[in-house]
């Protein structure tokens, strides 16, 4: 397959598409820029990123890791993109957070040593239908409305609501096939690299091939079970 044929394969991908996002997010600079915007913390540091297809992914298929970021303050942040609205999203977030927490814990750990985890759930629709681009879901004491810190932060952000904020502008980029926005240089440059430069196009095609092989294998296994 020529470079031009490969470019043709990846040209229609957008950041909201999970396969493209996974490759896009396999870059510390992109994730740091994204989380600084979504979590509104200009000093936030991303030290490492693990994606689903990475050999360093020790979580297996039990949890979806579009991008698991290890932050400078020791917290972990699992970022997931979701286009389909045919799921129970809150339970999905709860399940994935639980798997990550258990996987990163030892049986003799004290509970105070349980990891602090942030979940950022990016969707193509407004989950709560309250016309907000971002929602922070907290645990609270019902009787007093006081927030309880149990080490889990849940942030839901979407591409559907346009409210003129920087977060909304950034989220709108997730719907574009091509991005050229000086406010978001890391995202802009990474998308260009993956779509127009040989190294990036090859990287994208390799991941696509991996998923194609997995889908074929799963289909064969399912066929054997039926047979």
Regions found by a protein language model. Name each.
Residues 1-11, 15, 19, 77-82, ...:
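Short, charged alpha-helical interaction segments and adjacent helix-coil junctions
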């Amino acid at each position: 397959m020529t470079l031009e044929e490969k470019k043709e394969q990846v040209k229609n991908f957008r950041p909201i598409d999970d396969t493209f996002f996974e490759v896009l997010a396999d870059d510390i600079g992109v994730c740091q820029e994204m989380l600084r915007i979504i979590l509104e913390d200009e000093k936030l540091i991303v030290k490492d990123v693990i994606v689903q297809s990475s050999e360093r992914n020790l979580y297996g298929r039990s949890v979806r890791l579009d991008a698991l970021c290890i932050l400078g303050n020791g917290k972990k942040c699992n970022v997931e993109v979701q286009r389909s609205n045919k799921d129970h999203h809150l339970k999905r977030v709860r399940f994935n957070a639980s798997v990550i927490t258990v996987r990163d814990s030892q049986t003799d750990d004290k509970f105070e040593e349980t990891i602090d985890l942030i979940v950022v759930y990016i969707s193509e629709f407004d989950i709560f239908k309250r016309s907000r681009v971002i929602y922070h879901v907290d645990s609270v004491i019902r009787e007093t409305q006081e927030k309880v810190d149990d080490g889990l932060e849940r942030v839901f952000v979407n591409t559907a609501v346009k409210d003129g904020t920087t977060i909304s502008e950034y989220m709108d980029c997730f719907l574009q096939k091509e991005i050229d926005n000086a406010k978001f240089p890391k995202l802009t440059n990474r998308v260009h690299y993956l779509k127009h430069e040989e190294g990036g196009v090859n990287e994208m095609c390799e991941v696509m091939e991996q998923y194609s092989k997995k889908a074929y294998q799963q289909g064969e296994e399912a066929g054997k079970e039926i047979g």
